[in-house]
Amino acid sequence: SMSTCEVGSGFKQAVKNDVRVTKIGKFIRSTSIDELPQLFNVLVGEMSMVGARPHPIALDDKFSKLIQNYMSRYKEKPGITGLAQINNCRGETDTLEKMENRIKYDIEYSDNVSIYLYFKILFLTPIVIIFNKNVY
């Protein structure tokens, strides 16, 4: 969905109107089709359908120092979708406040995981994908 960046440039989060996103990439990212390969990770047991979305190591390193209990979001397996995503915490996390909000939902899910909440999130995810334009 994106063109490659320079070797050694490190992690760079996608942003609105990111020049690295290809034309076809814009479509597959806006419809979340680019998440489908993660189903393989679910099938082999490395991920769940629902859980905290995994972050790049660079973000984990950065925000684990800035946000109390950040790593407790990983008490459950990471997921393709989660409580944060159905509460419009998708897309760029360019401020500490946005990341704190996302982490709040991740921890809320891991502290209250239930079959009801799991299926509620699965049910609401496609609805949010259709109506939320905060993805690029």
What would you call each of these model-derived segments?
Residues S1-Y136:
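Conserved small/aromatic sequence motifs within transmembrane helices
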